[in-house]
Amino acid sequence: MSHRKYEAPRHGHLGFLPRKRAASIRARVKAFPKDDRSKPVALTSFLGYKAGMTTIVRDLDRPGSKFHKREVVEAVTVVDTPPVVVVGVVGYVETPRGLRSLTTVWAEHLSDEVKRRFYKNWYKSKKKAFTKYSAKYAQDGAGIERELARIKKYASVVRVLVHTQIRKTPLAQKKAHLAEIQLNGGSISEKVDWAREHFEKTVAVDSVFEQNEMIDAIAVTKGHGFEGVTHRWGTKKLPRKTHRGLRKVACIGAWHPAHVMWSVARAGQRGYHSRTSINHKIYRVGKGDDEANGATSFDRTKKTITPMGGFVHYGEIKNDFIMVKGCIPGNRKRIVTLRKSLYTNTSRKALEEVSLKWIDTASKFGKGRFQTPAEKHAFMGTLKKDL
């Protein structure tokens, strides 16, 4: 029959409403892993910038599967993760209505790239942020120690304020991203001492994550602007001869109640939503100073993770990086929060040991043929432009 039956599942998921633009380009982290005080103090999240995607080849290690010990080709995302700088500590107390901020202690010196975060127009400002606060350290520091003692005495959750070193990335933006990251492990006193010792110091990504670990990626998705109801909700197109348009919803509700219900599919914003993508396996935690961070035990070619010509619309990666399986929310250059998994992963895929055989470093602009400039020169010879 050409018409619809009397019943059918609704189009689109109502669990992600309202579908509106995110309040900030850096997505909020609404939950952190459960604290285990028997472990050493460590960060639970890290900040990075999405650089792009590439392809890898590896041998599948899954006994019992038809593809065990066979080569598989998978897509991976590379996230540029320069070391973050610890600039503050926040203590939270538990109340009947949830966590409440007790107090915040900042470091004595803050770089200009994070001070820009507190100004709308840095160029025309007097740049006096935190000058009065820094004077507390110059006097005797008793007030600072008093606030740290309050956190040790009353707080039940300790989080540190960290900011990215955006100047180390290829991005033109000069304003660093600032975020709160929870500290897990150890007692409250040990957490506060850890934060105090790391004031104005950097923390590398390899001290937070390791290979084969399962993590979550939290970011704002790519924006697509105002979109029609058919593409936004996946509703069915109307018949060809329908009056006044086909890509619409024919009936948007009953006569009464005399308003449009919130659950009815309508046109509006699509994309630029805050989303959390869970259970991404880390395939590699690379070092920025390693000139062969794109090589493997099978492919001994000396090459970096950056493809020829750089990642499209991003550039060259000169810092530490993380390679995760699959795609993550956001477009290139987008700030991404990488968080330890909230759950204990026991699946075979999560526990599998990953050993990469080959990483594609051909140009991502067009159909790349060569993995390194040396390989291109050996095939093409001396070009006229190089004479």
UniProtKB/Swiss-Prot annotation:
The keyword Transmembrane does not apply. GO terms for cellular component: cytoplasm; cytosol; cytosolic large ribosomal subunit. One of its GO terms (molecular function) is structural constituent of ribosome. The modification Phosphothreonine is found at residue 103. It is found in: Cytoplasm. The keyword Ubl conjugation applies. Gene3D superfamilies: 3.30.1430.10, Ribosomal protein L3, domain 3, Translation factors. Methylation at His-243 by HPM1 is required for proper 60S subunit assembly and promotes translational elongation fidelity. InterPro entries: L3_arc_euk (IPR045077), Ribosomal_L3_dom_3_arc_sf (IPR044892), Ribosomal_uL3 (IPR000597), Ribosomal_uL3_CS (IPR019926), Transl_B-barrel_sf (IPR009000). This is Large ribosomal subunit protein uL3. The lineage of its organism: Eukaryota, Fungi, Dikarya, Ascomycota, Saccharomycotina.
